[in-house]
Curated annotation (Swiss-Prot):
Gene behind the chain: IPI3
Descriptive protein name: Pre-rRNA-processing protein IPI3
Species of provenance: Eremothecium gossypii (strain ATCC 10895 / CBS 109.51 / FGSC 9923 / NRRL Y-1056)
Keyword set, alphabetical order: Nucleus, Repeat, Ribosome biogenesis, rRNA processing, WD repeat
Pfam families in the record: WD40
Assembly and binders: Component of the RIX1 complex, composed of IPI1, RIX1/IPI2 and IPI3 in a 1:2:2 stoichiometry. The complex interacts (via RIX1) with MDN1 (via its hexameric AAA ATPase ring) and the pre-60S ribosome particles.
Length: 518
């Protein structure tokens, strides 16, 4: 098991792995705005800088293609992309919800396409007053969260965006005073209704945590964390144990279950429901001993610093053991979460002296490393099938919703079913069992002279028969038992043959009755 890392800058796009050395550079890839690249299956969609164009690449680990596959023209330049995926695992949770491609412009306009057909479903002209910085679908695609440079965070219903002419937001949060740069949603949530935690970071140097619930009229603000620097990114541990916050001068690790002593015997939950707490973050300094309990009484928290450079984006590995920090110099640093030490650096392969700028997008996903085996031909066939799939051209005019609308999306394929043997029907299975029984019945009795005594207890080993008379008696008893079992097996085989003959006779009579009735 490995993790694939895809990161882009203003002049490059790189596909690599965390635990291996393979690397590929995507050609003609230029994404200068954050969150302007998304994955749609094995296809990578990148909104090009200063162009009304989306480049499509294949990032399948089996194909390893670097060339551009498709170009999708757009009505205007897009600065942010997101997708709403199909989730068919849970019955009753939007099983027919198609892939939706969301795109936003620097002016705050929101586009919603149906990726299966390319139809433009909705254009929200003033979704935000300024550029949208990030979009994400949550709760199995039921809701879409958008954050903008206008310091607002809006939660939309996906059905409202698709069906209504003028969709209205479900919630609007405007507690920040400057642009919201990033947000993260808790991994511990129910897949059927809105019940989760939302973390937002802003240039006003604060992190705010909200409790999202369908039973509340408005999201409840649980805690506010103030930092000494403007914040650029945020990531959440898979188990919701720690927040990783990025700034222009480094990244901080904020544990949500705060230790008041070095032994960890006393823990405090920083996100207590019903209380709005305000905490100030104090950077931890090496070699300086402080009283964490005294700082906590004053509303201050001690946080460790992971890296001392400009951090534009943060991603956490699948198991939470590593953190990927995208830097302002165009590379990614892999940091161990326990020791807070860098273990690897991922950099694009460019000519010396090339100015890459900060990393604008970073995407991680788990992948299975398969060695050469009997399934190699199957993997090659799947890779060719993936390459053959093309994303349809995106429409520039809004689709007319008055008539019927056929929903088109790619159905999932089960690769294991193609290699598993075909299930046997009952008559064939019974014939196979009868044949095996006849083989065992006609096999002569074989006596082995090997005695296994190593697995017996010492007391049982001493109780073994010593005289030859007792050994002969034991062998006779064994022969009698084998003869009895053989006789029982023959009786069962005969009964099975009689039952099968009766079944065939009744089946023939049934067929005759059907023919006469016609």
């Amino acid at each position: 098991m490995d993790e694939q890392v895809i990161f882009t800058t203003a002049v490059s796009g790189t596909v690599c792995q965390v635990h291996s050395v393979g690397q590929a550079n995507l050609r003609q890839c230029a994404a200068s705005t954050p969150n302007s690249a998304v994955l749609m299956g094995d296809k990578l969609l990148v909104a090009q800088a200063n162009k009304a164009l989306i480049n499509v690449y294949s990032v399948d680990s089996r194909s390893k293609k670097e060339a551009l596959e498709q170009r999708l023209p757009l009505p205007e330049q897009l600065s942010c992309l997101a997708v709403v995926e199909n989730h068919t695992g849970d019955a009753g949770v939007h099983q027919q919800l198609p892939y939706l491609l969301l795109g936003s412009t620097p002016s705050g306009k929101l586009y919603v396409w149906e990726a299966g057909s390319g139809k433009l479903l909705t254009v929200k002209a003033m979704a935000h007053y300024q550029a949208i910085t990030k979009m994400q679908a949550i709760i199995n695609g039921k809701y879409v969260v958008t954050a903008g440079a206008d310091s607002r965070l809006i939660i939309w219903q996906t059905a409202s965006l698709v069906l209504e002419e003028e969709p209205k937001p479900l919630y609007v949060l405007h507690d920040h005073t400057l642009a919201i740069t990033d947000f993260a949603v808790s991994n511990a949530h129910n897949g059927k209704y809105l019940n989760s935690k939302l973390y937002t970071v802003s240039e006003d140097m604060t992190v705010r945590c909200y409790q999202l619930s369908s039973q509340l009229e408005q999201p409840q603000l649980l805690a506010t964390f103030t930092f000494p620097l403007a914040l650029t990114s945020i990531a959440l541990d898979p188990a919701d144990r720690c927040l990783y916050v990025g700034t222009r001068e480094g990244a901080f690790a904020l544990p949500l279950f705060y230790k008041l002593d070095s032994s960890g015997a006393t823990l405090v939950n920083l996100l207590q429901p019903g209380k709005h707490q305000i905490y100030s973050i104090v950077p931890e300094q090496a070699g300086v001993e402080v009283n964490k309990q005294e700082l906590y009484r004053m509303g201050q928290l001690l946080c460790s610093k992971m890296l001392s450079c400009h951090v534009s984006l943060i991603r956490v590995s699948m198991d939470g053991s590593m953190v990927l920090l995208a830097t302002g110099s165009g590379n990614c640093v892999v940091v161990d979460t326990y020791s807070k030490q860098p273990v690897k650096e991922l950099a694009p392969l460019l000519a010396p002296g090339t100015q890459t700028g900060p990393v604008s997008n970073i995407i991680t996903r788990s992948m299975t490393v398969k060695s050469d085996s009997l399934l190699q031909d199957l993997n090659l066939a799947d890779a060719r099938a993936t390459e053959a799939i093309k994303i349809p051209a995106l429409a520039k005019t809004v689709f007319d919703k008055t008539g019927t609308h056929d929903i088109i999306y790619c159905a999932p394929t089960d690769t294991l079913s193609s290699v598993l043997p075909r299930a046997l029907d009952l008559p064939q299975y019974l014939d196979m069992i009868a044949e095996e029984d006849s083989v065992f019945a006609n096999t002569p009795v074989t006596r082995s002279t090997v005695k296994v005594v190593g697995e017996l207890a010492p007391a049982k080993a001493e109780a073994l028969p010593a005289s030859s008379a007792e050994a002969q008696q034991s062998a006779d008893d064994t022969d009698a038992e084998v003869a009895r079992l053989r006789e029982s097996l023959q009786q069962l085989t005969g009964a099975y043959k009689d039952l099968r003959a009766l079944h065939e006779k009744l089946y023939e009579e049934h067929e005759k009755l059907l023919q006469t009735s016609k």
